[in-house]
Amino acid sequence: MGRIKEKESKAPSLSESHTDYEYAATAATSSDDGFDEPNRVPVHKRKVQLTNGEAKKKKFKHADSNVKPPTLEEIKEIRDTRNLFHSNLFKLQVKEMLEEIQLKPKYSNYIETWIETFTITVQELKDGLLDTCELEVPLHLHKKSFNFQFLTPTSEPKLIGAAATGTLLGPKIVVDVALEMPAACFQHDDYRNLIYDQKRALYLATVASKIKQSPAFKADQFAYNYHANNPLKPVLELTPASKLGKYLLLRVYITAQSEIFKLSRFLPWTNNIRPSVFGDKWNEAETLPATQHYNANVLFDLTLAENQKLLLSTFTGRRNFQEGLLLLKVWLRQRQLDVGFSGFSAHILAAYIAYLKQQRLLHQSSSSYQIARTVWNQLANSDWTQGITLSQHQPHQLITLAGYYDVCFMDVTGYYNLCANLPLAVYKAVCAEAKLAVELLNDVKVNSFSHIFMQTSPLYTRMDNILKITNPASVDQLLQLHVQPHVKYDYANYAHPQLLKLLTDLLQKGLGQRVHAILPLEVPCSPWTVDTKAPVIGRSLTLGLILDPEHAHEVLDKGPATNEDANGAAEFRKFWGNKSNLRRFQDGSITEAVVWATATDAPSQKRLIVRQIVLYLLEHQLQLEPSEVQYIAGNLDVVYSLTPSFKVAKLQTKLKIQQETDAEALTPNVIHCYDALARQLHSLGDLPLDIVSISGISPVFRYCEPQPLLPQARLVSDRIHAGQVLRVIIQLGPSGKWPSDLGALRSLKTAFLIQIGQQLKEQHHLHWHLCKDGLLVLKQGYCFLLELAHSKELALLKQQQTERGVTTYVDNPASRELERRHYILPRVSGALHALHQMHGAFGPTVLIAKRWLAAQLLDDGLWPSIATELLVAHLFQQRQTPHTTVSPQTGFIRFLQLLAHSDWSGELFLLNFNNSWTEQQITDLEHSYRSERDSYPSLCLATAYDQQHAGRLWTSNNSPSKPVLGRVTLLARHALQLIESSLLSPKLAFVRPAQLFMASGDGYDLVIQLKPDLLSNTLCYDLGSPFLPFSQRNFRLPLAGCDQLAKVVQQLRDAYSEYAAFFYNPHGGKELAIVWRPASEFAPKPFKVNELQACTPCVGGKVQVDRDTLVEDFKLLLKDFYLRVCTPQELKREQREHNKPKRYFNGQGESEPDKPQKKKKKASTIPTNAKKRLMKSKSMNALC
């Protein structure tokens, strides 16, 4: 269910930056750690009568003991832990995190010194005209020419925001400073037509120009930036020249006094931007459109001082409130919902805390945890669409004000909407996250701390589909032809919110119940130097779509009936255009409808229905061609699709298989065949024992096999040839007649399998073949391997006799493997199959993840495939996001996030299938894991079916090892960087599959090229090798269950793992890459008879391991597979020289000197009849 993160608790310490007055003020209401003290109830203790000796002893002990009685603070902490938290661990984690994020005294001292210096410098500024400003004005608007004179500020600069409330949060500490413009800088009508914004920008540029010349700031870095990606809000960023500049940034805001303009001039229904500003004409008889969003932009400056007073009265001197806000800011930042023009900022959170305090939902003595929990609880059940207010005397009705905004949260003046730029979808997303946080806190089986505070969850990892519009011509087309004029005036012609409103309204109407939310994906604007012009931002749009799993893949959009709602039907036809048709349904109704797919389409095609709808709407409604936009959905599905090199037309099967199919679409065919075989096995009546159950344990039975399984298994010369073997476990009924000898029992099992095979042949005409692993059965082109399971075999494997002849039962590797394969894996396989039925994206996510790991040259010997399945299942089981993804591509990105940011040394991955584990069992396992960490593997996975083997069954210390885990972490981080940069950059297209699913050829010492005619190609879409170009295809079927290369590689690892590490791609790889161990393993060592493998004599009577000798040993083990050995550098040089490496069927081993070419012989002619006989040969068809 959850991941348990091991942490060490630190001793509580008091911050040295607090004054004695602060501690005295908080001691009466809250402890120093911010946790609440419940009301103390007098406890009446019963006196115990003591004997004289006991009394004297007790008195003496109290008199001489150095142990002090518990203080009130300690008693209060114990009570808090019991009343508020599930465990002491959660409280210690919260406490430790708060200690880590507290502002260090050196930063607070520097900020105090800086603000004093800045105040002195500002007061020394002299009045002057704009001509004295040598810097660029940080504004890109339709400017009006007017004279502007700089006047010295009449009030001192003030700290605002987190710096004023004591809630600064790193790692990059941003300190906001407000500098108020004098009232004399403005005239009566400056509130109209963007004049206020121009004067504000001119004033900022003049301040920057004059301060930059000051000796106190001359060494600092000066830059401009936009506050919250708002081009009307430029700020000055100063980075100190000292070492603190790496972690500290100071931003200067220009504000104005609230008295310069009447606040009533900025009511939402008033207009303050005339159409003539943008060269538009307007009919004077019509009412001017409201500019509520622009008005709110000006009110932000005018009301800043009043709102700051409220926040100071709420947070100053209250450490519990400050720490509560810090917890909320960490939670919000980890989800990246506070980014950009449309973000839910921390300022809104601080104001909401003040609102809850006004409503008496927060008490002054509330602990930091109680504050955060209360905020989450209230947010989860809130509805700001009707409006809430901080004002004690709201001048206008909230319902009227709320009609002009998506979300309404009025400030202390009652005029400024704190959420003016907040879209409804973002607000609902924050509420959903808050609801999830409360649910996690209430779940005692989950370590909610890591989920809420520690796990980074970027917003793009929650999106199922992503739409990007970055083409400048397309953006201009949308703004000029489709955006309404009143929207342009409302946002002062800022492109981003105009595009956002246009697209979200259209897509929300077209998609309806198919989407949960449509959210903007923004990136913070980058600063620019003060001597360059302000950049134009917002000329692109990236939208993320969170799909509804119940409705997203519906193939039909049904409209209103024509005879019941003629107007609605006409509007439906107009909206959908030619896609809409009149249809009759089975219930007899005749309505307009739009069909996007058929019910028999593959799941991967149905997942693209939303993509099809969006692209059609953009083309039909907005005249945007599909080539002009980027729609990111299903881009990575190609990695488990069938390679076009294999032609399904040559398959001899009754199944209808399309050429453009994939592993997911082919899996139901396998399962249907398996179900038919299971029914046939149950129908066998002449067996000595009953068949209790039949379970498929191969990955395909849980939709986790990335190789497309085609019905191509054949019988050739009484031997079954198949690309893959499907394992099936048969559980037999109880019987007391099984022998007590292990060898005899297994011989009896073999006889039982022979009898099953004979009956399958006689009754159902199925071919079978006996092998050492079980019974091979050929059915409908698929090969099944039947194994018999009986509990007595497991008991005999565990049976041991002591020296005294006592029989004991002890677990050993063989018994654990048998128990895992026969008893535990069938249950886990069934649970994973059920998980796929519940979440259709689970199986395809596993397919992509397995293909990615295989592409990094990690086979089952280095990274068990079942570990990938369980990790992905863990992602789908845990409630890390409010909505489970329906996109395998998003699931894969979350899988990469898990690999990139997991602490393998301290995390236990629990999969509590069907809630089979009790709370006590989970607690015991966690305790065992923390106390005996070294006894568990590096990657620790535990399922509810593992019994006493929990945590040690699916992985080992060598598979995967710590170096492999470290390499996978680095590879996942690099892959995430590629994905994130391509998703969020307006200039880049989404990453190509070949960039992710082809390993780098660097870092390897040797490459052993294998003969491609002996190795079958993968049926998956082949993205190439990191070492060599494509070779001739080879789709010959090997003997069933014969994977010689995997066995040889395992032999190499068993024999030479001390000296080298071996890597290859199990999905059709034709090369074996080798990395030598560190040089210390090859240093001279003393002569020992049992340590002479690959050694040669050297000086001093010592021996030394020789790499050349090891290579010869490798060749000997590889035998017929070996073609040649070379280095990656040699392969690159060959490719540069256009020399084809010998990866083809005509390869002749090691490269040899050039020889004179022999004369070509004429090809022998084969008679036509012989050719026909050869083509009709079943043996030839089976091997092709």
Curated annotation (Swiss-Prot):
Keyword Nucleus belongs to the record: yes
Presence of the UniProt keyword RNA-binding in the record: yes
A matching Pfam family: Nrap_D4
Keywords: Chromosome, Nucleus, RNA-binding
Source organism superkingdom: Eukaryota
GO cellular component: condensed nuclear chromosome; CURI complex; small-subunit processome; UTP-C complex
Gene3D superfamilies to which the protein is assigned, alphabetical: 1.10.1410.10, 3.30.70.3030
Main location: nucleus
GO molecular function, a single term: RNA binding
GO biological process, one term: ribosomal small subunit biogenesis
Subcellular location: Nucleus, Nucleolus; Chromosome
Family of this protein: Belongs to the NRAP family.
Free-text function comment from the UniProt entry: Part of the small subunit (SSU) processome, first precursor of the small eukaryotic ribosomal subunit. During the assembly of the SSU processome in the nucleolus, many ribosome biogenesis factors, an RNA chaperone and ribosomal proteins associate with the nascent pre-rRNA and work in concert to generate RNA folding, modifications, rearrangements and cleavage as well as targeted degradation of pre-ribosomal RNA by the RNA exosome.
Oligomeric and partner information: Part of the small subunit (SSU) processome, composed of more than 70 proteins and the RNA chaperone small nucleolar RNA (snoRNA) U3.
Protein name per Swiss-Prot or TrEMBL: Nucleolar protein 6
Organism, scientific name: Drosophila virilis (Fruit fly)
Classification lineage: Eukaryota, Metazoa, Ecdysozoa, Arthropoda, Hexapoda
Originating gene: Mat89Ba
